[in-house]
């Protein structure tokens, strides 16, 4: 594959993932994926995000007969007490999610997959996050902003949700939805040049 390739397909509509790719100088074309994101019975959070990231990438590949550029896909989930927290379906559910993490550590798992003519590579980023102790009023005020509605775990660390986080151990960009270290590594493996970096 041509080492001078600088464009990829991004299998995501996430503005946060787009922002992070712009940050590292990778141009992309969005081709949204459409797969079933249901959790399997007794499926671990790590296995869940790896399966979805791989499935999203391969689903997009199937719609690209030429596959002239690599496809990057990702999936993020939050896990507390072994329970997977996806995107809240209502403000009530968002409040419950935030209450379950209040004053406690939880994990954010983000898997990425890069598919090319040579196959599909995957990587996993896991970050521990400590949320501050939150009162009902603080939770209600945050949820009323609307920010939690499209976020796994009902918060966005890059926005107002960042004021609720005391500490993280791991990848900040991974919590945002695209771990840049792992992403750059897999893209370089596919011949995508990342400005200012090398193997």
UniProtKB/Swiss-Prot annotation:
User: Which keywords accompany this UniProt record?
Assistant: Cytoplasm, Hydrolase, Nucleotide metabolism
Active site positions, chain numbering: 75 (proton acceptor)
Instruction: Report the Pfam families cross-referenced here.
Output: Maf
Its Gene Ontology molecular function terms?
dTTP diphosphatase activity; UTP diphosphatase activity
Question: Mind telling me which CDD domains this protein's record contains?
Answer: Maf (cd00555)
Looking at the UniProt record for this protein, which Gene Ontology cellular component terms does it annotate, in alphabetical order?
Answer: cytoplasm
Identify the enzyme class: hydrolase
> What is catalyzed by this enzyme?
dTTP + H2O = dTMP + diphosphate + H(+); UTP + H2O = UMP + diphosphate + H(+)
The record, for PANTHER family, names: BIFUNCTIONAL DTTP/UTP PYROPHOSPHATASE/METHYLTRANSFERASE PROTEIN-RELATED (PTHR43213), BIFUNCTIONAL DTTP_UTP PYROPHOSPHATASE_METHYLTRANSFERASE PROTEIN-RELATED (PTHR43213:SF5)
Q: What does this protein do?
A: Nucleoside triphosphate pyrophosphatase that hydrolyzes dTTP and UTP. May have a dual role in cell division arrest and in preventing the incorporation of modified nucleotides into cellular nucleic acids.
- Return the HAMAP family for the record: Maf
> What NCBIfam families would the database entry show?
maf (TIGR00172)
- Protein name, as recorded: dTTP/UTP pyrophosphatase
